[in-house]
From Swiss-Prot:
Binds 2 [4Fe-4S] clusters per subunit. Transmembrane segments: none annotated. HAMAP family: NDH1_NuoI (MF_01351). Residues 52-82, 93-122 form the 4Fe-4S ferredoxin-type domain. [4Fe-4S] cluster 1 binds at residues 62, 65, 68, 112. This is NADH-quinone oxidoreductase subunit I 2. InterPro entries: 4Fe4S_Fe-S-bd (IPR017896), 4Fe4S_Fe_S_CS (IPR017900), NADH_quinone_OxRdtase_chainI (IPR010226). Its EC number is 7.1.1.-. It is found in: Cell inner membrane. It is a peripheral membrane protein. One of its GO terms (cellular component) is plasma membrane. [4Fe-4S] cluster 2 binds at residues 72, 102, 105, 108. GO terms for molecular function: 4 iron, 4 sulfur cluster binding; iron ion binding; NADH:ubiquinone reductase (non-electrogenic) activity; quinone binding.
Length: 162
């Protein structure tokens, strides 16, 4: 055994340095928050509960192009388009999302040419039954109406990166 190794083992330098490292972290402020009462701000790119948006005049944005249905890797979206209207546009008759299948990848939101389907800021949508996780058009539109202000703000903040 050489003198260096003997000195290190007698002086317990590794133990002392580990102790001081632990003490440094022990006295730092903790990053934990008191969750239900305090919430961290979420990113504008956060992908939470789905919502269908409307135009400011109240008309729904979805034009039944079915791009979101085609791009969904989990095949969680089902759309039925209604007949063409006099002005040549279409609207959806049925717009269902199976949230059990959804993987929250955000591809539906990226594919939508009119920003109709978005993933909103809500992350607290736990349910007691599986059937409550099958979202129909009415529920998606209600989510959009409820979260429109936050969704519009997130889209505006994310605009430079789109």
């Amino acid at each position: 055994m050489n003198i260096n190794a003997t000195a290190r083992s007698l002086l317990l330098t590794e133990f002392v340095s580990a102790f001081f490292l632990a003490m440094r972290y022990f006295f730092k402020p903790k990053p934990t928050i008191n969750y239900p009462f305090e919430k961290n701000p979420i990113s504008p790119r956060f992908r939470g509960e789905h919502a269908l948006r409307r135009y400011p005049n109240g008309e729904e944005r979805c034009i039944a192009c079915k791009l979101c249905e085609a791009i969904c890797p989990a095949q969680a979206i089902t759309i039925e388009a209604g007949p063409r209207r006099n002005d040549g546009t279409r609207r959806t008759v049925r717009y269902d999302i199976d949230m059990v299948k959804c993987i929250y990848c955000g591809l539906c939101q990226e594919a939508c040419p009119v920003d109709a389907i978005v993933e909103g800021p809500n992350f607290e949508f736990a349910t007691e039954t599986r059937e409550e996780l099958y979202y129909d058009k009415a529920r998606l539109l209600a989510n959009g109406d409820r979260w429109e202000r936050e969704i519009a703000k997130s889209i505006e903040l994310d605009a430079p990166y789109r």
